[in-house]
Structures are given as structure tokens and as C-alpha cells.
Amino acid sequence: MAHSPVQSGLPGMQTLKADPEELFTKLEKIGKGSFGEVFKGIDNRTQKVVAIKIIDLEEAEDEIEDIQQEITVLSQCDSPYVTKYYGSYLKDTKLWIIMEYLGGGSALDLLEPGPLDEIQIATILREILKGLDYLHSEKKIHRDIKAANVLLSEHGEVKLADFGVAGQLTDTQIKRNTFVGTPFWMAPEVIKQSAYDSKADIWSLGITAIELAKGEPPHSELHPMKVLFLIPKNNPPTLEGSYSRPLKEFVEACLNKEPSFRPTAKELLKHKFIIRNAKKTSYLTELIDRYKRWKAEQSHEDSSSEDSDVETDSQASGGSDSGDWIFTIREKDPKNLENGTLQPSDLERNKMKDFPKRPFSQCLSTIISPLFAELKEKSQACGGNLGSIEELRGAIYLAEEACPGISDTMVAQLVQRLQRYSLSGGGASAH
């Protein structure tokens, strides 16, 4: 590949033809982030420890727009509460993204050994709020706030990570109406594809607060496709159990279904739960040490199992999701969108050239496309048949072209059946 699609016109991209393998020493693999693998590394010029995300652009063709988005947003950010970005280098088909090294793990990792106390929860939430306050003041929204996307340094500093679906708010109303994020943490207005703003991040923060307290988000036992229908329909989740009234009120304030009634990040920094409980971030080093001890014990117990392949340091942009179907829905390339719905690739268009051009079901871009991307990724990881998955995806597009709207009908029927199955005792109740 002579020229990468991201080689020119990308903010933050190094224009010098420097060889990243000469500038940086790549050490052990420490994570699997969005789009690529993450390595610990050394900047040979300064001897500073860095994180190196390496992406094969030939394998990540479908994610080029998201990679560009992440680099663009990170290169525009300058905050102690956002993961620092040092630059990008292109070598052959490999893109090297150099970032701040954060060796304390993700907030999700820190939950693995056991629950957090309310002082730890408040301290982490305060730092997330500082990051959100900065982003929102810069007219940016993160759109994928969750514990897995919150990273810590070895000294307890807390930083926001994974900006692959972040959005720039540019119009006078400061609204977006794109459908991105991770289902369990998504605000109702995002799922309904209504216009939304930075208050969508506040809803996700409320879900993250429940996640930090309980170890998982609400509805985690359900299939994400079902959750996409439950969140707009049901009352907002509440934090149940023996937690303090201020923490429950903090969650309740974030999880108001009316976005305008949710507080801003700046207002939440003054909430009594934060003021009364949050401590200096150095307090979190005890939590990091606990996680490292637990991880060492686990590696001894599981050394002969496939868990030896699991990344350990978690400089991972959301790479710690435990569920097989906790996918992040990413915004599609505008060039492949028409009237807000996903259009087929050139290959699919060639297959369908004899059909008249018609609009496609909305669910193709919001549900089916991300689902097939996840299927392909998991099939590739276990040596499955990628061709069969691609054939099935192509068949759905062909059926859609022949009968517009059939995919929306199919998904609606699937959800109804899931709900009936759930209510008849086959799973958790939808009510």
C-alpha cells in the first residue's frame, strides 16, 4: 500500500518521514484497544515510557474514519484528565499512535478483585467529571463513557480514554443525532436518535456510577439488542442496596430521562456525594496495588489456560468488556450514508446493480452492521469462517434491496420474541 488513507490531511499526523521503529523501542503487549493492539514502549530520545497503539490499516479499512476521529480529538485536547497524545507515524501499512502510558489499569480492571468503597467511587467520579467538564467546555462529547474507558496512572491519576466515537458539537444548538456508544451505557435520546448534546455523557456517567458500585451496569444480564429497546421504554435505573443516600441521589440526578433536567459536569462536581467523599487521587494507589496483587494471583492460577493471552496492563481503550456482545456502536463513514441509513459497499452494489436504488432500513446502520463487525472479529479470533459471515451479511443487504424495510421488520419481530420469551420465564422480566 503506497499511500495510507490517513497519511495526509489528518490533524496530529507526523509529516516527517521518521521511522517509528528507530524513534521508539516496542516492549511487551499491554492491551487491545479500539482498532489495534497496545504496547508499552520507550521513547529513545527521552527514555520516557509511552504507550504505542499499532494499527494495520489494511486490516482496519472499515475503521479508518474512526481512527481519524480518535486522533483528531486527542490532538485537540490538552487536559490532565484526558489521555495525552504525542503523535502518529506511518510505516508501510502500520500506523503507530504514540500516547501517554497509564500503568494503573482501567476503572473496570480495578473492580475485578472486589467492590469499591464510596470514597474510591467518589474520587474516580470526580476525576471523570473534571474530564467531562473540560470536553464539554471545548464543545466535545465523549459518547462512550464507561469504566473500561477510564484509565489510571500508577500514581492514581484518572484520565478519559477511547475517543473513537467522540463528537464535535459545531452548530448553534450544540446537538448531534448520530447513534453511537455502547448499549448498556447509552442515553434514551441517543437510542431514539433524537437530537442530543453533552447531557448524553451525563447519563452514561450515571450508569458508570452504578457500574462502579455494583460491578456491572443495569440490564447486564440481557442481550444488548433487547437493552436498546428497554432503556427508552422503562423508568430510569436506580442504585439499589446499602449505599449512602448522597450516592443514590447522584445517580438519580444523572439518570433523568429529560436531558435538560440533568446537571452539567460542573454542577455535579459540587454535588454533596463528591464534596463529602472524594479524596486526593493518590488514595487510589491502594486500589491499584490490590488489583496488581489479584492479577498476579490469577496469572499463577490460570497460567496453563487460555487466559495467558489476556492483556494485563489495560492501556486498553475499552478492551476490558467482559460480555461477548458488549459492542460499541460507531458512526458510519458519511460517504456510505444516504438519508441517514447505511448504504452497501461497492462490492454489494455490484451484486445489486440490476436492482433499482431504494432506501435501506435504519437498523442496518444502528444494529446489524455493528453486530456483523463483532461477529467477524470474534470469528477471526477463533479461526472461524469469515466468508460465511460475509455471505450472510450480503444476503441481508440483497433482501433489503429487493424488499425495503424487511430488516427493520425482522429486528422488531426478534425483539418481540425476546420479550415474550423473557416474560414467559425464559429470562429476566422486561418490566
UniProtKB/Swiss-Prot annotation:
Keyword Transferase: yes
Motif (Bipartite nuclear localization signal): 266-280
Record keywords: Acetylation, Apoptosis, ATP-binding, Cytoplasm, Kinase, Magnesium, Membrane, Metal-binding, Nucleotide-binding, Nucleus, Phosphoprotein, Serine/threonine-protein kinase, Transferase
Region (Disordered): 297-325
Record site: Cleavage: D313, S314
Subcellular localization(s) per the UniProt record: Cytoplasm; Nucleus; Membrane
Residues in the signal sequence: none
Residue stretches making up the Protein kinase domain: 24-274
Comp. bias intervals (Low complexity): 313-324
Keyword Membrane listed: yes
Annotated active site: D144 (proton acceptor)
Matching Gene3D superfamilies: 1.10.12.70, Phosphorylase Kinase, domain 1, Transferase(Phosphotransferase) domain 1
Binding site for Mg(2+): N149, D162
Catalytic reaction annotation: L-seryl-[protein] + ATP = O-phospho-L-seryl-[protein] + ADP + H(+); L-threonyl-[protein] + ATP = O-phospho-L-threonyl-[protein] + ADP + H(+)
Residues that bear Phosphoserine: S4, S308
Quaternary structure (record): Monomer. Interacts with CTTNBP2NL. Interacts with RIPOR1 (via C-terminus); this interaction occurs in a PDCD10-dependent and Rho-independent manner. Interacts with PDCD10; this interaction is required for the association of STK24 with RIPOR1. Part of the core of STRIPAK complexes composed of PP2A catalytic and scaffolding subunits, the striatins (PP2A regulatory subunits), the striatin-associated proteins MOB4, STRIP1 and STRIP2, PDCD10 and members of the STE20 kinases, such as STK24 and STK26.
Family according to the record: Belongs to the protein kinase superfamily. STE Ser/Thr protein kinase family. STE20 subfamily.
Name assigned to this protein: Serine/threonine-protein kinase 24
Encoding gene, per UniProt annotation: Stk24
